[in-house]
């Protein structure tokens, strides 16, 4: 009987602690890019509605490239990373492309604007409107790109990641 009472008392103590922790979870990524009160920084999720193509495609970095037939995915997106027993030790190692169309709000003019990729696996190139902004050669690591000077205001802009 004593054990049951101890268990109930411990449970009653721990339940409010868990509730407090759950209420303080960040609304955005745990990578540090979440909205902070009174910081002046705005955060916009670009994760939904990327165009995806598995394979080599010439000219896919160009803003006017036709990606209408590509698969639509949300990020993060695993290309084809399967467990060894499911893939026969053969995971896809070729080229892939991701493209995102967006029109920036005029209210953002004059501000510093960055793309923050929480992680890109392996070698990659990031283009905005056909212009190569950075190359990444690491493992599954974050990539941050300043896009302030390459946006076309009031028009369709395209991020392309190879």
Where do the model's predicted regions map?
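Intrinsically disordered, low-complexity sequence elements enriched in Ser/Thr/Gly/Pro
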Residues: 1, 15, 97-98
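Bacterial N-terminal signal peptides that target proteins for export
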Residues: 1-8
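Bacterial N-terminal signal peptides
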Residues: 8-17
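Accessory carbohydrate-binding/adhesion or oligomerization-edge regions at the termini
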Residues: 19-89, 103, 133, 158-162
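Accessory beta-strand-rich segments of carbohydrate-active enzymes
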Residues: 28, 32-36, 44, 56, ...
